[in-house]
């Protein structure tokens, strides 16, 4: 689990905008302090030195996340990956 930054604002289209401390991969799961899934990384934009992240929320009221710190969880964390035979 990696800290990605604080939520700055909510777009009219319902996306959360976060200023990135560490850049996650597109498609990674995003969780809050309580490890509750809040969305997925949709886009990364802005200058390379201080990028912004657009997160597509999966919760009914994303406005409650304004000002909160979010974390990225890679797909392999918390799961065991075995090849099916």
Stretch-by-stretch model annotation:
Residues 1-85:
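Peripheral interaction segments used for macromolecular assembly
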């Amino acid at each position: 689990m990696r800290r990605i930054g604080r939520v700055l604002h909510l777009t009219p289209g319902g996306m959360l905008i976060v200023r990135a401390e560490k850049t996650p991969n597109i498609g990674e799961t995003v969780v809050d302090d309580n490890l509750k899934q809040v969305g997925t990384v949709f886009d990364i934009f802005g200058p390379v030195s201080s990028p912004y992240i657009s997160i597509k929320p999966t919760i009914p009221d994303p406005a409650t996340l304004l000002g909160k710190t979010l974390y990225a969880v890679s797909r392999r964390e918390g799961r065991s990956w075995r090849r099916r035979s």
